[in-house]
Amino acid sequence: MRLRKLMCTAMSAAIVASMAGCGQGKPAETTAAPAAAETTKAEETKAEETKAEETKAEETKAAETKAAEVSSDRSNMFDVIETEGRAIDYGNVDLTPTAEELEAMKKEPAYGKPVRYWMSDGCTSGPNVANLLGYYEEAGLTAEGVKGTSYTEALGTGAAEVAVGHIATMLVPSTNGVDLTFVGGAHIGCKSLYVLADSEYKTTEDLKGTRISTPNGIGASDYNITSLLLDADGINPQKDVELTPVETSACVTAMENGEISAALLSDTFAYKLVQDGKLRCVRSLLDADFQGEPCCIIAMNATFVKENPVISRKIVGAVQKAHSWMRENPDEATQMLIDEGLNSEDFDMNVKLNNSLQFGLSTDFTEAGLRAIAEDYILSLIHI
């Protein structure tokens, strides 16, 4: 489903909710004099403001309590938590085109041309794995990998047909005219907010008034993920903290020098540092309140999907089948990624982390997550 549609739905829901919260319903009939009516209106307004303040205070307290709970112990943060309806089993799906599908594919402009998939590593390597396992070929397609500086740009310009990437990276571009669309879920998790293990920062509440690194830049995925994590705890990412880009490799030193208090890092990068007692996680996309949302997603060039609907379904099926295989065969998948240079050499660490991501998300889970993410993003802007 196109994110624009989801965003419009989320916006409508948010607007309706705001109207419902602020509306006073049908006014009661009255014969009171204008002055009396004005007094009554003023009293009602004051009562509403008081109620709003009380509600805000309750929400803030609840957010602080939740933050304290989710930040207290993350010794098992990478353990798999099964959620009904989250995964989709594509492992036994035969991608071979039926006679009817093949005839339809032959009529599409992309027929006979190689599918260009974005070559990426780690948790976004599903399109690569689909090629390595022969799933594009099974679907009646040929494929070739492409590289560059930005999968968002590659999808938007038509330099690539399909990629897996962070929703947080593509959310805003997809609503600002970039020619891409979301077509399926990839996995949950993969990034968290870290502080020095011996620091005074225990929860996100403790980070108020400090500088936090969002390594890949203002407005990019790290910035957006950090904003959502903070906003979920009642912390305004624009007013209560300062978000600043510090390169991932320099973040620990910057923390030690007091230049930043925390950093949004990939769990793969931070894992060994946590094990060695250098870093500690205070908030994560793997926390219970974010496990109901996808982190990375399958995206395609929107015009390509419109002009080649049958071929597009086959492409998505190939990537989804790869994700299912990665979830069901974590050891083999991890070794494949290591052999292809798509994962670091630490086998045990990568098996654990890859397991926690729960590759292969169902359509229902993904759509519900997209709605929640879009709404959260809109609300975070409203709170500014």
Map each language-model feature to its residues.
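Bacterial Sec-dependent N-terminal signal peptides
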Residues: 1-10
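Hydrophobic core
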Residues: 11, 15-19
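Secondary-structure end/capping motifs
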Residues: 306-380
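Short, glycine-/small- and polar/acidic-enriched structural segments
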Residues: 33, 70-245, 261-267, 278-285, ...
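Long, intrinsically disordered low-complexity tandem-repeat segments
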Residues: 40-66
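Conserved small/polar residues in nucleotide/adenosyl-binding loops
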Residues: 382-384
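Bacterial lipoprotein signal-peptidase II cleavage site
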Residues: 22-31
